[in-house]
Every structure is written in C-alpha cells, then in structure tokens.
Amino acid sequence: MPNYCDYEMKIKGSKEAIARVLECLNADYNYGEGKPSHKHFFRVFDATKDGNARKNADGTYTQLIYGYCAWSVSSCMLDGGFSYYQSVKKDHPEIFMGTTLAEQSEDCEIEVFSEEPGMGFSEHYIFKNGECLCDDECEITSGGYDESGKPTEDIDWDTYEGETLIFNPYRFGRTQQFLWNI
C-alpha cells in the first residue's frame, strides 16, 4: 500500500480544458483488461471539485480541485524516471493512454501543491502551454506559533509541547491558504 499524497490543484482555462483535466484525474483504467477508453493520470484516488468553476474577468474559468494520489504528484501525474507514466508506457506501449500535467496544460494553466507526510515532503508545480514553469520540492517542516498566532521559525520534527507534536504547514513561504500563482 502506498503512502498517500494530498494535493490541491488550480486549473485556469476554458470550461472544456477544465473538464478534460478532471476526466483524466477521475479516469478508471486497468491495463490488465485492455486499452483504456481515454487519457488518464495514474493512481489518483480522489479528485473533488471545490464548487463550480468561477468565471474570470478575461473570460477564462478557474476550478479548484482537492484530492489524493499514491506517493506523489510527481509519480502519478508527471513523466519522470520513477513515474507510473514511464513504467506503464514501457510495459504496455501498444495500448498506452497515460497523460501528464504538461500534456494537459497545452491550452490551460495548472498549478498543484501537494503534501506527503509519510516521507515528509511537499511539492509545487506550475504548467502552462505544455511547459513546466515551476518544479519545487521541499521537506515538510514543523514549527510553533507565537502569542499572536503567527508561525515561529522552524523547529525540529520531534519537538513536542506537552504531549502534542507541533506541526507547521508553512512551506514554500506561504500560509495554509496557498498563495496561488495562476
């Protein structure tokens, strides 16, 4: 069983582009049963829309999606050396229907923040016009809060306050509410 990776994704583009990415996130496939019916990411277990897409001033739409996948966004939605994309493409080249965030961003912008607490890392990606504009990964840090509720500097992972582990979700210089770039 894999460690789960929680992600939050923002898609900006046409309603059709948003629907296409959602279809890839929610796709049901089994290469043991033959060719999948459409493009898909790998081992995405949940992709839930945060309400309806919101219309932007420029006529595009923005949709937030929350979900979880196996191990990392990198292994499930990208085409790197240790990705499901590469291994399935190698094992089933004749019926392969996998896709990546880069491929799906040809006519939209996609930004993803993820967190995998089992191995203690977080990811941040931005894709636009098929290009990766941001590929960041960092360790999940822990910290405390001062009396005003602002985060203090990072403290050791094993720091406890009484019986409570102090965990600080502040990484990539952002607060719990992600500072979206798209």
PLM region spans:
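Charged interaction segments
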Residues: A27, H38-I182
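Short, extreme N-terminal segment that most often corresponds to the first beta-strand
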Residues: M1-Y31, N181-I182
